[in-house]
Amino acid sequence: MMLSTNGGPASPTADGWVNYAIPVIAGLMYRDSVEIDELKHPFRVESLGVVADSAGAGRHRGAPAQEVTYTALENPVQVVIPCDGQFAPPRGVNGGHDGTPGSTHLIDHNGHTTKLPNLVNMHIRKDQHIRGRDSSGGGYGDPLTRDPARVLTDALEGYESIGKARDIYGVVFTGRIEDDSLAVDAAATKARRAELGSATKTRGRDPAAE
């Protein structure tokens, strides 16, 4: 089964593709239907979606990671899971931030979570869950140079939080997502980026030179 695809890397001209998967697929992979897989196999998908704040930040953003959680409907159910990329996150380029590594966890009935290795061949019970997360994409270029309008779109799409927009991209908003009033505060954004840029230079790195 293939229910999710890891996020693709940013490039000098574009953000990473959410449906990138691996280079040989080039975004053209057909993902399984959750409903059909649930009809064919003794399991239920509890959640499937992108992971907020997982993407590698940059002038062009890497694609966010995707996460799926599922449980068994019978006792026991065998699962075989390959999960590469748990130790070396996708790298950012030219000042872009690294993406986040993949992971697989077993969740017991009491909520206790156990991290699983790269390759798993095991049985799970009806009261257990598997949570798998793909890698996200690394960013390209310094985040402080990203178009604030793109950061706003990312926040509205749920790819980036308002906190990450402020702390990493230096973009400040007014309004709220809930009532469709979220907007870029241009003056506050200019001041915030100047503040973050000054702090970066103090640490020995100049975004303007990248």
Predicted regions and their residues:
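Glycine/proline-enriched, intrinsically flexible loops and inter-domain linkers
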Residues: M1-A209
